[in-house]
Curated annotation (Swiss-Prot):
GO terms for molecular function: tRNA (guanine(46)-N7)-methyltransferase activity. InterPro entries: SAM-dependent_MTases_sf (IPR029063), tRNA_(Gua-N-7)_MeTrfase_Trmb (IPR003358), tRNA_methyltr_TrmB_bact (IPR055361). Its EC number is 2.1.1.33. Catalyzes the formation of N(7)-methylguanine at position 46 (m7G46) in tRNA. Transmembrane segments: none annotated. This is tRNA (guanine-N(7)-)-methyltransferase. The active site is at 131. Substrate binds at residues 135, 167, 202-205. It comes from Nitrosomonas eutropha (strain DSM 101675 / C91 / Nm57). Keywords: Methyltransferase, S-adenosyl-L-methionine, Transferase, tRNA processing. One of its GO terms (cellular component) is tRNA methyltransferase complex. Pathway: tRNA modification; N(7)-methylguanine-tRNA biosynthesis. The gene is trmB.
Length: 224
């Protein structure tokens, strides 16, 4: 067995943890959180219904996650986030919006996918603005790698989709190559897809567009 620690796609930075975020984290995580487990979970049982299940990896502060879930009450959403301020912020938003179709798993996405989620259990996967790790020596830390995409495919139902959005051209090119190399995935566009109506424009994205940044969406579906 290798003694090398796994390469992580994130760094747990000690960011500002507001009183409201901390309070939400401590008081609401038992209600809306799903504890990490090395055993598979039944999402239908957790949500109390049979409905399409969408996974979001890296929900940030939760603004987009909550907006999408609020606009689509017919679907169930599972967010994965590791940074405490973001977890607290998302929990606070869930409570204020009264959402019953959104839960969060505060753990490493790769471990969640490997242990908790079963094969062909997801109807869609969102990865919006992952850390681009722009320096060449850090490219190995990028989340979108062939082995990880293969794992995502295993968890997607046939006909399910994988949606990645990034404002880094180099990361978009990298992701397009990795996704196109996965034989089970089919690109819905010639290269980059138009932004679908369900993905709202974030404040971060609007600022970037004013500065001339191009946002690129990649949407692939799993072959039936």
């Amino acid at each position: 067995m290798s003694s090398h620690p796994p390469i992580r796609s994130y760094v747990l930075r000690q960011g500002y943890f507001s009183h409201a975020q901390r309070h939400a984290y401590e008081s609401l995580l038992p209600r809306y959180g799903i504890p990490f487990s090395e055993n598979p979970i039944d999402l239908d049982s957790i949500f109390g219904r049979t409905a399409p299940k969408i996974l979001e990896i890296g929900s940030g502060m939760g603004e987009t996650t909550v907006e999408i879930a609020a606009q689509h009450p017919e679907k169930d959403f599972v967010a994965i986030e590791v940074h405490a301020p973001g977890i607290g912020s998302l929990l606070d938003r869930i409570e204020k919006h009264g959402l019953t179709n959104l839960r969060i798993i505060p753990h490493d996405a790769k471990l969640v996918l490997q242990h908790m989620l079963t094969g062909e259990s997801l109807d869609g996967i969102h990865i919006f603005f992952p850390d681009p790790w722009p320096k060449a020596r850090h490219h190995k830390r990028r989340l979108i790698q062939s082995d990880f995409v293969s794992l995502l495919c295993n968890r997607l139902k046939p006909g399910g989709y994988l949606h990645i959005a990034t404002d880094w051209e180099d990361y978009a090119i990298h992701s397009l190559h990795v996704l196109s190399s996965e034989q089970r995935l089919i690109n819905t566009a010639a290269d980059y897809a138009p932004r679908p109506a369900y993905r709202p424009l974030t404040k971060f994205e609007q600022r970037g567009m004013k500065l001339g940044h191009t946002i690129r969406d990649l949407i692939f579906t799993k072959a039936a």
